[in-house]
Amino acid sequence: MKRLLGYLKEHLCVTILAPLFKMLEASFELFVPLVVASMIDVGIGHHDIGYLWKMGGLLILLGIIGFSFSITAQYFAARSAVYTGKSMRSDLFAHMNQFSYQEIDQVGTSTLINRMSNDINQVQNGVNMFLRLFLRSPFVVFGAMFMAFTVDHKAAISFVFTITALAVVVGLILWITMPMYKKVQKQVDGVLKSTRENLLGIRVIRAFNRQRSEEENFRLQSGQLYNKQIHVGKISALLNPLTYMIINLGIIAILWSGGKQVDLGYLTQGQIIALINYMSQILVELVKLANLLIILSRAFASLDRVDQIFALEPSMKETGKTDIEEKKDTPILEFKDTSFVYHGARKETIHPFDFAVKEGETIGVIGGTGSGKSTFVSLIARLYDVTSGRILYRGVDEKELKPEFIRGKIGFVPQKASLFEGSLRDNMKWGKEDATDEEIYQALDIAQAREFVDQKEQGLDFR
């Protein structure tokens, strides 16, 4: 929550102006039932056409002013929410870029993507709705009750009971559903994780003939999400019928008690209409407030998930030596009693071993699928930190060196080639920012990838 407030403080002006203009709009809205009441009692009651035109013009004026304030408030609220979402997303992306493979494996790529996109969108939507309604709805509810007491305090007593009953119903439904939304969000992560694992591991799944098992697992994950969404949806669906029932009972109470007072001459027909209009305003605003609280419950659940990522500290710090003394007799790379275990795994992927490579040597590492070849290479580039033992680069423990320095000295080619956004030339310049086209083509020839580029009409400009 403190983090969110920090983002809102960066745009404090628009954050304050949004609810302020909404309050002004609500103030004009509260006068509308009184104007309508006077039109009924005076204009229609006395057949005063001029008065009706005058009051009709006043209604139009109130509507135009209220609409202007509403549009202005929506603009400021949307601007504050978008700024907040943009800043939070940028900071989260920068924080995630500091993660090693260990943190990415621990949290899960699908979860990180979900929190970067869906969760921050939920927070952004929550901020937008909060700024628009968190002051307006309570102001209209209590303002309508106050205005009802100015019309007739006896008839307005039903407002107190109605608002109390509505508050109990809304509060009870929210108390039940808010924890459920957190479970739904967590289950969405499970479905995304299952989908991603199947897409990325499709070759292995087919190789071991595990399609049916994976289909059952996905069906289970999807079914659990469906059941949770249906369950919370059924409870939330009770909100509208219960609130409308309570409001209609309140209106019946007003008509019953007010009708008697009209017959006795204590109330006018216009005043009864005004009381009913105020009751309708309360209904609309309480439904809005309930929906706001539901949106906020989702937003807070998403904010908590985003904060969990911010709270996760990278295991590899971007600190260390960036220069070392090169010794002739020292191996360029050396593993000393090195072992590695993936997060959550029961067994070691790489058992303790010793290994050394001297400058100029060419060594191939062979092994079956899952034997640890890719893990071994990842440890060299320090994409992971070893579980035990040490890895030395030119006699210096890699943990004492800055990760950027290590990766600048080691060429790492992943098993699966990936092209990032931009042209082929932009991708090739990742290795050398000032590379010329001749140098790029020379590198493509060495990598035997020149044919792939030549097949494209745009050549290096292909996107």
Spans of features found by a protein language model:
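Transmembrane helix-loop-helix hairpins at lipid-water interfaces of multipass membrane proteins
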Residues: 9-72, 76, 149-154, 265, ...
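ABC transporter nucleotide-binding domain catalytic core, centered on the Walker B motif
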Residues: 201, 263, 394
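Short intracellular "coupling" helices and adjacent cytoplasmic loop segments at the cytosolic face
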Residues: 46-47, 82, 90-114, 118-120, ...
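An intracellular "coupling" helix at the cytosolic face of ABC transporter transmembrane type-1 domains
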Residues: 10-13, 77, 98-102, 118-127, ...
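Helix-loop-helix
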Residues: 48-52, 147-161, 231-305, 309-310
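ABC-type nucleotide-binding domain
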Residues: 326-463
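Hydrophobic alpha-helical transmembrane segments of ABC transporter permease domains
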Residues: 20, 28-32, 69, 117-165, ...
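Juxtamembrane helix-loop junctions of ABC transporter transmembrane domains
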Residues: 1, 20-21, 25-37, 41, ...
